[in-house]
Amino acid sequence: AHAYALTGDAYLELGELDEAISFYKDAAAYKSNEFFTPKYLTKLAIAYEEAGDLKNAIATYEEIETKYSDAYEYSEARKQKARLEGLASN
């Protein structure tokens, strides 16, 4: 999973957002666990936002909120989801 995420990071740096999104999805889906999966989902949400896909970015942060409430990323996911919901409603 970590290799998928690192590849996603490289594509994100290159601005190849569709590829980054694909690799982050693979990273999050590979042997899901409480520690790494929320990290990969956060990267996925960021890539969605950079691609202008606020709906999927919000849904990804929502997934972190509902499935990983004990994760370090939980509070940041809540904050970013609220921010994006505000942008989406304008």
What kind of region is each of these model predictions?
Residues 1, 28-36, 65-76:
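Short solvent-exposed coil/turn linkers within tandem alpha-helical repeat scaffolds
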